[in-house]
Amino acid sequence: MLCARGTYGKAGGLGFEKNWRLNKELAGGGILLDQGIHMLDLMRYLVGDFTQVKSFVENLYWQVPLEDNAFIIMKTADGKVAMVHSSATQWKHKFSLDIFLEDGYLVINGIVTSTRSYGDESITFAKKQFEDETYAFGRPREETIYFDYDDSWKLEIDEFFDCVTGKKDQPQGSVEDALKVMRLVERIYSEAKN
């Protein structure tokens, strides 16, 4: 893996500034804690632990004391870079994760939800193609797979059950992982103040 880029945003909407998600006592933070933390968790899982963090945590539109946008660039000790944008001013629900590899890339878009508000969930992948510079250069052949059903909740419950009953030692998402992503969020907020 070379680098990754993720966007996780929502539309906001009428009365959004009064929503519990923008109430510090109830939510603890703004869009970074609401949605950004999930993208950060994915980035840690895919890219690794980050040793450098640069961030802008901003209130660009909603008149509330919490952030409605977080812009984050992070780097691992071995040089992998990840960029995250978490937004409550996307004006449409959006989930997008681009993963760039030495020999190609993956693009994940959408989330299967009951409302389908994040669009169709898909994964697109392609290999880099330098051999035919007249046609394929900059336009590699892509393949896209669409997903109509979300079984992640069932898989998580099954894994939890296997851990509790001793069939599996440790879940993929541990308490240590949760603590590490919360510490990363603290670093992002702290870096944004500098």
PLM region spans:
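C-terminal helix-rich "cap/oligomerization" subdomain common to oxidoreductases
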Residues: A77, I145, L155-N194
